[in-house]
């Protein structure tokens, strides 16, 4: 079984990755829930563990442009930067969800489609999930979508 809790697994996965992959749900299936939050199109959105998913691109095309995408994998971030160089408002950064480099109360919405699951597969899983949730709570001023 893959070690989803190991950052090296993700680096290797995206090194050899072709195309894109959406964990669990795509944007279209979550769109009704997101729209019920009544966020403005100018909302600041944090996409945790973006991988190479088209989720942020679909959200961008729906009018949400202020999306900060993070992932622990440099390879994933490079893929996404290359794919989205024309979407200037979106940012892509290598970052650990347990140590977010954002100011307090920065985001209106945080989206996590499976990063928490990956942390639960690693060593010190409950401690790592607690660190992630504490960091997300710190940077979030609005709603949270798991």
PLM features: what roles do these ranges have?
Residues 38-39, 84, 139-142:
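A generic alpha-to-beta junction signature in SAM-dependent methyltransferases
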Residues 108-126:
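A short SAM/SAH-binding and catalytic strip from SAM-dependent methyltransferases
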Residues 46-99:
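Class I SAM-dependent methyltransferase SAM/SAH-binding core
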């Amino acid at each position: 079984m893959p070690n989803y809790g190991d950052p090296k697994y993700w680096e290797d996965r995206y090194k050899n990755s072709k195309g894109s992959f959406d964990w669990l749900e795509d944007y279209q299936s979550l769109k009704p829930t997101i729209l019920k939050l009544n966020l403005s199109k100018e909302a600041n959105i944090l996409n945790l563990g973006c991988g190479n998913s088209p989720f942020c691109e679909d959200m961008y095309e729906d009018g949400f442009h202020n999306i900060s995408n993070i992932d622990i994998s440099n390879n994933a971030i490079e893929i996404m930067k290359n794919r989205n160089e024309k979407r200037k408002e979106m940012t892509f950064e290598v970052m650990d969800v347990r140590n977010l480099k954002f100011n307090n109360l920065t985001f209106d919405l945080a989206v996590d489609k499976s990063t928490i699951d990956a942390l639960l597969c690693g060593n010190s899983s409950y401690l790592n999930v607690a660190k992630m949730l504490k960091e997300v709570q710190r940077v979030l001023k609005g709603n949270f979508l798991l």
